[in-house]
A protein has these predicted regions:
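N-terminal Rossmann-like NAD(P)+-binding domain of SDR-like oxidoreductases, especially those catalyzing
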Residues: 1-147
Length: 147
C-alpha cells in the first residue's frame, strides 16, 4: 500500500515541487487549498487529475477544516508548508500572521493527536530564512544569530 502524504500549502512553489517529488516516489499525495475567489492552482495544474493526487479544502485558521482533512486522509506524513509568507504583511498584520503561521501549527498537531495518529504520523514543519533578518553567513544553521 502506498504511503499517504498530506501537504498544506501544496499550491506554493515548495508544495508543488514536493507533491511531484513524492508522487514520483509512489506516494498518494493529498494537498490542502483554501477556498478563494482567485484561482491560484497554476503550479499544480499538471498534477490535477492524476490518480494519486487529491485536493481538499482547508484553512490554517480553521481547526475544524484541518481536523476533517486529517481524519479523512489519515496520512503517514504531513508536510506543513502553508503560511502567511509575505514579510511586509507580517508587520502590517501581525495577529493574522501569528494565527496562520504559529497557531496553525498547533491546529495541525492537535488534529494528528485527536485523530489518534500521534504515534504513526511523521510531521515536517517548514519555516523561512527570513526569520534571521540580515544574515552575515550563508547558509544559516542552528547557531546563526537572529537580527
Amino acid at each position: 500500500m502506498a504511503k499517504k502524504a498530506l501537504i498544506t500549502g501544496v499550491t506554493g512553489q515548495d508544495g508543488s515541487y514536493l507533491a511531484e517529488f513524492l508522487m514520483n516516489k509512489g506516494y498518494d499525495v493529498h494537498g490542502t487549498i483554501r477556498r478563494s475567489s482567485v484561482d491560484y492552482r497554476e503550479r499544480i495544474a499538471h498534477l490535477e487529475g492524476k490518480p494519486n493526487f487529491h485536493l481538499h479544502y482547508a484553512d490554517m485558521g480553521d481547526s475544524m477544516s484541518i481536523m476533517q482533512v486529517v481524519a479523512k486522509v489519515r496520512p503517514d506524513e504531513i508536510y506543513n508548508l502553508a503560511a502567511q509568507s509575505h514579510v511586509q504583511v507580517s508587520f502590517d498584520a501581525p495577529e493574522f500572521t501569528a494565527d496562520v503561521d504559529a497557531v496553525g501549527v498547533l491546529r495541525v498537531l492537535e488534529a494528528v493527536r485527536l485523530c489518534g495518529l500521534a504515534d504513526t504520523c511523521r510531521i515536517y514543519q517548514a519555516s523561512t530564512s527570513e526569520l534571521y533578518g540580515k544574515v552575515e553567513e550563508v547558509p544559516q544553521n542552528e547557531l546563526t544569530p537572529f537580527h
